[in-house]
């Protein structure tokens, strides 16, 4: 396993410990995905930027009140209570797109390894169609 993948895999258990994913562990795990996406090539630069931007958005919100945002779901609860959960610039949408990107990347990597003859473009197109 390459170094970026190993680093990401090492963070997954901490991110998923407990009934709700811890915010800091989840963000560290998601942040570790950025170099993995970068290693997949220039064609996926928009995904890399999107993942990095959404992680940064969530980190900035958490930094405002770290004691309030202990769980990933605390972001959603806070925005729902304030009536801000539908905002395009909010953490709820950022989290939604971050999770969609993770599903896309998981499917892309699965397809690349399943059929080494397929081009990355074909694998990315099929992954996009499957999960987005």
Question: Model-derived features: where do they sit?
Answer:
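Long, contiguous alpha-helical bundle segments
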Residues: 1-132
